[in-house]
Amino acid sequence: MKKIILIAFSFGILSVNAQQIKLEPGKKITSTSTADMDMDMGMGGQMKIKSSSVNVLSITGSDDKNYKGTNTITKMTMSQEGMGQSTEYDSDKKGDRDSETGKALGKELDKPVQILIDRTTGKATESNPEKTTEPEADTNPMAGVMGGMSEKTAAAMVSSAFFIIPQGKKAGDKWSDSTTEAGIKGVRNYELQSISKEEATILLKIVSKGVISKEIQGMQMEMNMNTTAQSIIRTNVTTGLVKKNSTTGTVEGTLDMMGQSMPISMKMSSEVVFE
């Protein structure tokens, strides 16, 4: 009986603390992410890409609804092999920063972005969003293609640092939601795999499909993509802060450009650790 009471008490703590994230002014959250991607674009057009980045979220204040802060990308690395070429980039190396690749990848480096974080949902928005340009796409079509497939705003980076478990959920419970953004419709299915007084593990399965349109060198390009992905998320149930997110996924689709259609197949994996 005592054990049952303790378990019930743990669930009670989860239900209360999951309602809002908890942050203190001056707190810094560092996220270190790594990603691997293998892509096949048909006709021998294969490419391997490895990348990593470090983001620092600094909490500067709060009000009744939001936390205020800044998000800064402090480090980026990338290696790319394919189509007879290879590229290496490390933002810590001055020579790499001054290269064409460095100028394209480093445009957001060390640039603080003002962020608002909803206390209840953990969703982040940019306080003063700026319209970004993509000069690299004018001279490098592949950069434009990759940009269209991997765009991630500062707000999205920050949002991934938080996970709010719906009130009353217990181990084994499942729920779902859906999103529509930038021409992509997705369905997300969650399962609360385990929970303790301080930590929970969530299995997230995502299925999405849609079309992304971009203009590169005056030419219209469309990417039709069907994506399936699976994530294991470890989160602190008291604060709502994610500790680790590990994801694997596949993309199948086509790239339509200049009257031609090219098949695209991609496998990807990523890991983000928050400290």
Residues covered by each model-derived region:
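Bacterial Sec-dependent N-terminal signal peptides
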Residues: M1-L23
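Signature of exported/secreted
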Residues: Q19-E275
